[in-house]
Design a protein with these regions (language model features):
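Conserved ABC ATPase signature
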Residues: 142-149
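Conserved catalytic motifs of ABC-family nucleotide-binding domains
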Residues: 163
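Helical segment within the ABC ATPase nucleotide-binding domain
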Residues: 181-194
């Protein structure tokens, strides 16, 4: 009797960048970057200011085009299959790009509706998120009436309201006080334990070490390290190099 063996298929990465290149005029923002993010991973994308972190995120989410290379989300090209890939991603940007003419509840409801969530479900999700982040009493205000920390929480709510498979966060705790920072950290860890893939940019080594399973370091548009958190923390020369990069960027 002939036995048939079932071939094992390799899991498709949640995010794959292949030789990504992005220029602004003569400035090389991203230089031939390749990386993979496994489904369910928590990646800390470290780098000093101006290293290329935000540009990488903008390329993944379709906010910026690029000159060469490719980006895939669960095996789908983000350019050719934009309408299929974009709903899979929740983006929490640095800037407060919120509509001042909507209440904060409606900001979330409209965001969910944009990604095809039925109105009744959108309202339920919006209210649940606002309650979790202690914003439910502010739901009828416009975002300009919120403090900086509240705006930061609202951006996270907006990124999550359509229940994406991937959560991309660009410096989500920038300007947050210690209490809010720890609240966000705990919530992100909970989401990751539930299976959500998280890609977080930061220039705080403490934040990356606390949250991440995988740490990648980018500098001057190139990946200079990619590996497990344990590998980075054991290699003191790598940690020292990152601190030097951060200090050099601050001194520029």
């Amino acid at each position: 009797m002939v036995k048939l063996f079932k071939l094992k298929t390799m899991p498709v990465p949640a995010i794959r960048l292949s030789r990504l290149t992005k220029r602004y005029g003569n400035f090389q923002a991203i230089n031939d970057v390749s990386l993979e993010v496994s489904e369910g991973d928590f990646v800390g994308f470290l780098g000093p200011n101006g290293a290329g972190k935000t540009t990488t995120i903008h390329c993944i989410t379709g906010l910026s085009n690029f000159q060469a290379g490719s980006i895939e989300v669960f095996g789908m090209d983000v350019v050719k299959d934009y309408r299929r890939t974009r709903p899979l991603i929740g983006l929490c940007p640095q800037e407060f790009n919120l509509d001042p003419f909507l209440t904060i509840e409606n900001i979330l409801v409209y965001q969910a509706g944009y990604f095809g969530v039925p109105k009744i479900d959108a309202v339920k999700r919006a209210r649940a998120l606002l309650h979790h982040f202690r914003l439910d009493e502010k739901k009828n205000l416009d975002f300009r009436k919120l403090s900086g920390g509240m705006k930061r929480r609202l951006l996270l709510c907006r990124a999550l309201v359509h229940d994406p498979k991937i959560l991309i966060l660009d410096e989500p705790t920038a300007g947050a006080d210690l209490e809010l920072r720890h609240h966000i950290w705990n919530y992100l860890q909970e989401l990751n334990h539930q299976g959500k893939t998280i890609f977080l940019t930061t220039h705080y080594m403490e934040e990356a070490e606390r949250l991440s399973k995988t740490i990648m370091i980018i500098d001057k548009g190139k990946i200079v390290h990619s590996g497990t958190k344990e590998a980075l923390t054991k290699d003191q020369s790598l940690e020292k190099r990152f601190l030097e990069l951060t200090k050099a960027a601050a001194d520029d």
